[in-house]
Amino acid sequence: MLEFNNSTPLTMGVELELQIVNRRDYNLTRGSSDLLVIIDKTDHGYDIKPEITESMIEIATSVHTDHKEMLAELTAMRTLLISAADKLNLGLAGGGAHPFQHWEDQRIYPTDRYRLVSELYGYLAKQFTVYGQHIHIGCATGDEAIRLAHMLARYIPHFITMSASSPFYQGVDTTFQSSRLTSINAFPLSGYMPFVTDWDSFNAYFDKMSSLGIVASMKDFYWDIRPKPEYGTVEIRVCDTPLSIEVAVALAGYAQTLSKFFFAQQELKPAQDTYLTYSYNRFQACRFGLNGALINPINGTQTSIKEDILQTFEMLADIAQELGTTEAIELLRQRIQAGQSDADWLRASYEKSGSLSDVVRQQSAVWMAR
């Protein structure tokens, strides 16, 4: 039986997985252990930990109600990380996938869980050297978390599109805006969670999967959105790690604003038909970004993802004003209206330099604010 630890509605937090690169050719390097040794010599109080391979490090914010306070915390965490990285002559970068690393070169970080994942999934574990942003939104009850997860599912293409930053993979332009999610698709428990409508039903599903020996904990579900009962949150897991912390925080502000809308509109109920077009819309966002198509399965209309995002921003304007997220949404709006995305920026950088090493150098400079 999973217990949902109720939390304050609309509180939020983010996790960011970061690339660790050398400063010679800007390939990934096994630097997480050394970074953590230096970082942990200071009494910082931040949540900084290793990830599945040694060329990754994860930072997680504390719980926030205001996106500006979240940005201040991430800025301080970035300063701490940069100081440690400089001592080791390492670089740190955002981006959903390193442009030219090869999965077979990666080494699993030595924890019991990561060893088990590696034994179970084989080479997929090393291919999981991709970098995402996870956004948590607090919910008062498990029932509300299940409802919110389903209501947000229709907007998953928005989060994919606005964070997309993985056009290159293993030295190749994939033609995708976000190639990262294709790595996650290979896991058997990826995609979307089943259409259960309350916490008791979700518990029954989890107990059944557990009794069949398929899962041992919620960590075994790699869904795009999932409840996080120990935190009392809904977790959005589709975002590539943006190139800057400012965009990461703006995305969290957008998630908070959408969630407030759904908390206020309790008469809106989850619709199972949302999932008829879920995989199609998700693919369109990964492949084409703002130019992708989005089909509404309820009324059968089709629009561009760009137009759907901008219409949603308009719908949320009053709520954003009330919540204090207008500035966050305006940052996203300006990028969209200008046709800007991190994926396009990375491609433009490659067109200018002709060197993926130089692309990583530039994206590292962006994240490290240099």
From Swiss-Prot:
Keywords: ATP-binding, Ligase, Nucleotide-binding
EC numbers on record: 6.3.2.2
Keyword Ligase in record: yes
Disulfide bonds: none
Coiled-coil features, chain-numbered ranges: none
Pfam families in alphabetical order: GCS2
Catalyzed reaction equations: L-cysteine + L-glutamate + ATP = gamma-L-glutamyl-L-cysteine + ADP + phosphate + H(+)
InterPro entries with a match to the protein in the record: GCL_type2/YbdK_subfam, GCS2, Gln_synth/guanido_kin_cat_dom, YbdK
Gene Ontology molecular function, alphabetical: ATP binding; glutamate-cysteine ligase activity
Enzyme class at the top of the EC tree: ligase
GO BP: modified amino acid biosynthetic process
NCBIfam families: gshA_cyan_rel, PRK13516.1
Homology family: Belongs to the glutamate--cysteine ligase type 2 family. YbdK subfamily.
Function summary: ATP-dependent carboxylate-amine ligase which exhibits weak glutamate--cysteine ligase activity.
Name this polypeptide is given: Putative glutamate--cysteine ligase 2
Organism: Janthinobacterium sp. (strain Marseille)
